[in-house]
A protein has these predicted regions:
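Acidic, two-metal ion nucleic-acid-processing modules in DNA metabolism proteins
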Residues: 1-158
């Protein structure tokens, strides 16, 4: 089982769930037991997985087409949007699907690259709280230049 704080969703989040149900007899009558097999934001299409695969390919050094690079290269405003969202709510570090869904499935690649860039320049870090890993803002030590993030340099140089 998982503790509730390890689930990357908050009260009110709309999710699609795959559940295994079983019915068993007990002295009080038939009982229903359920086990969650998978959770993800409701209504996700294929864009999230497709763009996430481009980001994985980028990290592995696999060449991307110009079109693929354009899909996952964030503008400064995209990175600011991700930073503000991380400021507004505690997001799980190990499952970024809810964050990507909130910021638009079509922006998944840009969101994932923005999170990586923010981590690489030291503006955010993964911290463990209550058995779960979260993305947390790091108090800035001097000025940070997003252009110094290796992931962004890699996208420019491809």
């Amino acid at each position: 089982g998982m503790h509730p704080e390890q689930v990357p969703y908050s009260t009110g989040d709309v999710v699609d769930a795959a559940i295994s149900l079983s019915v068993y007899d007990s002295p009080r009558g038939a009982q229903l037991s359920g086990r969650i097999l998978d959770l993800h934001p409701a209504g996700l299409g294929t864009k999230l997985a497709e763009q996430a695969a481009f980001v994985v390919a980028l990290r592995r050094g696999t060449p991307l087409t110009e079109e693929q690079k354009k899909l996952i290269t964030p503008e400064r405003s995209d990175i600011v949007t991700v930073y503000r969202e991380l400021q507004a709510r505690r997001w799980h570090a190990e499952d970024l699907q809810p964050l990507c869904a909130k910021l638009g499935e079509e922006n998944t690649g840009k969101t994932l690259v923005a999170v990586t860039a923010l981590e690489q320049v030291g503006l955010i870090a993964t911290v463990e709280k209550g058995g779960a890993k979260y993305l947390d803002l790091v108090p800035a030590q001097g000025k940070k230049n997003l252009a110094d993030a290796p992931v962004l340099k890699c996208l420019e140089g491809m």
